[in-house]
């Protein structure tokens, strides 16, 4: 058995769509994280690893931003990956031309639709916004591109106007419409309501682009899928503007383990992908980050360690090797004899029961003095109790 979750999950009557597309925006929205700037080779390396995972679509960048960005997007588009390569564009002909020049498979055009954005940012009326959006959709489709239209700040947009703009986008040939929860301001219940309302009016695919300002990006994405959405936007490690986006690894594993929806991804590379993005973005993954954090499979408490050594699933919902992660027993204040003995066995060291108890006592004392029990300190402790040993 590789995982063990609550049997009550199966009691709920849930219906996911038959087809779910994940389009990853690590290379675009992820790069918009303050302080992050990826070079072409770094983007290529991440794109290759995403492709190895089996991601369906990669949002490779925003070509009009700079010449270097165009080089990066074009390099990814011509890398021969299995994933569809998308680019972000404003609802402007020049933006779409820049994307076309990069040889991408499709574009995501976006425009803010909330009255707040229309008034204070775009200085447009609703009618003016409608016309601008449709002209760009028509232009992109005339050039044979996959076209997704994203309503920025959709979750704070008047519902009737949102329906109107999505209906018109569908009529103009959009392949998909995106609900952008731009500031993470909707609840899972609100997302459920919104998607169901939109489903009454439009037949085109609906995607969820959720931000994590209130820690609800994953829940909102899943709620949207259950309500009739068919695609989700993600980033590796959940990076992105402000509090970030729906985490790719969390979504994939929640669907697979909690909901038993297997999208066919090569999940064995998830941990490696996480570390690659950490390296290139220079954004350290939090120790307790779900799925890929370093603490997720670390155990210190004596009671926990005893159980995990006997059966890992006592204190792990799934085995770390599923995603290329590793389990680690950490020594500290809460460690017991079993944990220390396991650590000694790693180095092939035998001790008497009395020596073991003394080593445990010294481990606890040192940790309570604020010292981290690394291999060097552990060696010194063992040496002080048992005499010289080979590590």
From Swiss-Prot:
Domain of life: Archaea
Catalytic activity: acetyl-CoA + 2-oxoglutarate + H2O = (2R)-homocitrate + CoA + H(+); 2-oxoadipate + acetyl-CoA + H2O = (R)-dihomocitrate + CoA + H(+); 2-oxoheptanedioate + acetyl-CoA + H2O = (R)-trihomocitrate + CoA + H(+)
Disulfide bond entries: none
GO biological process: biosynthetic process; carboxylic acid metabolic process
Recorded metabolic or biological pathway in which this protein acts: Organic acid metabolism; 2-oxosuberate biosynthesis
Pfam families: HCS_D2 (PF22617), HMGL-like (PF00682)
Alphabetized InterPro entries for the sequence: AIPM/Hcit_synth_CS, Aldolase_TIM, LEU1_arch, LeuA/HCS_post-cat, PYR_CT
Domain Pyruvate carboxyltransferase, chain residue ranges per copy: 20-271
Keywords: Transferase
One Gene Ontology MF term: homocitrate synthase activity
EC nos: 2.3.3.14, 2.3.3.-
Family note: Belongs to the alpha-IPM synthase/homocitrate synthase family.
Function: Catalyzes the condensation of alpha-ketoglutarate and acetyl-CoA to form (R)-homocitrate. Can also catalyze the condensation of alpha-ketoadipate with acetyl-CoA to form (R)-homo(2)citrate, and the condensation of alpha-ketopimelate with acetyl-CoA to form (R)-homo(3)citrate. These reactions are part of the biosynthesis pathway of coenzyme B and biotin.
NCBIfam families: LEU1_arch (TIGR02090), PRK00915.1-2 (NF002085)
Protein name: Homocitrate synthase AksA
Annotated source species: Methanothermobacter thermautotrophicus (strain ATCC 29096 / DSM 1053 / JCM 10044 / NBRC 100330 / Delta H)
Organism classification: Archaea, Methanobacteriati, Methanobacteriota, Methanomada group, Methanobacteria
Gene coding for it: aksA
